[in-house]
């Protein structure tokens, strides 16, 4: 801690999930610490030091600005000194003085054999653990500095914005949009009851498995939508201005009423691919599904209109109307055109992409902000007695407690805003589901699986849907010889070129899985178990424990009913049917 660095920013990549676990306990002993935490993630830490706390550093997580690994960022920004590799799992308390052969590839994290061989060739039995650890850490710092330096320069040249004023990418994207592209302050900052009401119907992308396996000899085509959310932001009318509350069926008075309507929803029984999502209660917690049946929920008016065309019926009970306007077209068009001017390996392409995809996140951010205070143990009992019901977490750090609690000034008045507009976010996700609905219940398209922005089908797609260079159009990602879909984010693909694509949500390393594993999982109650490492973070003890755990992989009925044949093999799925209790 040196005075000349007063008011400097210290960037640490992935600080919240790694470095701060070791640092925070010691920073508390060296000065005054004020963390800013949102959704259990440390955004930044204000650190004051000196005799009277007159000097300040701010520790920031650069991952929140540049959402990628440091290795990939070095490639994207073409820095002079790129991040290296290191055998993290080789190090233990008994071999700190090790000198010898380069440790086996199994001790390195997520590297290719070619990269390992290239690294190993630099040594001749003289690999020194201590020296290489220091070199690795120093190079991490140098490469991160070069990435941030380039990023800062490019953002300022483009938009005259100082990156160091914004702790996250969505906050930077919003600042750029607000100063360069927003013509007037017409985005409503919704709070309190209105925000809670609209959030009732706020769901993300629709992910469903319909057919678990393709017949032998039948190819499955995997298509992605080109920049789904930005495409809908570019074309969609957004809810702006001040909302107006109404009761009854507003469409009887104003057939063009626009906003969010709380409705009784009746889905057609014969629909193959339901297109309206809702939150339901299960014995395993809350799930988001696309059911049939009848229930009540909040819905964006444009999504309601689209669903009517698919046979849904709605009885509007109450809601909020808004003015409407296309507010994002200039922002998205500028960034998309900028991106198209540069090759994918150019950092400008990367910057345009991340800014285009990050603005949406700002509007949908959870506005239930909590305050975090570092309270000395001597003063904590008084604080606890006064605010016990509002304390959500307490972590011991030496002579202090890191206390998370609801903001004191908001306890009596829940009308806080943080530049959050759930109406905008809800409209964007709704428009995106509307866009994807054109591929569902289409007699010309046989669907196996759909994700937020992708479809998997064995049908020939009309060429009018396809254009890899146009926002919102489909682009063919893969042609698959074999495909097995088991659940949301759980599938196996073998492409025509022989490449295996395996997706298992929650499993860090799926490389040991193969086609036969997924084939066997089609059998009822079959289970595949794999060992993987779980990182257990402990702020109080400044430790990260890596524990080997068994990860169980199986078919789930979280989203749809599973249909088995007489041999107990999974062959299809069916819609859940719900009523107003929304329980399955």
Give the residues covered by each predicted segment.
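Conserved acidic
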Residues: 1-584
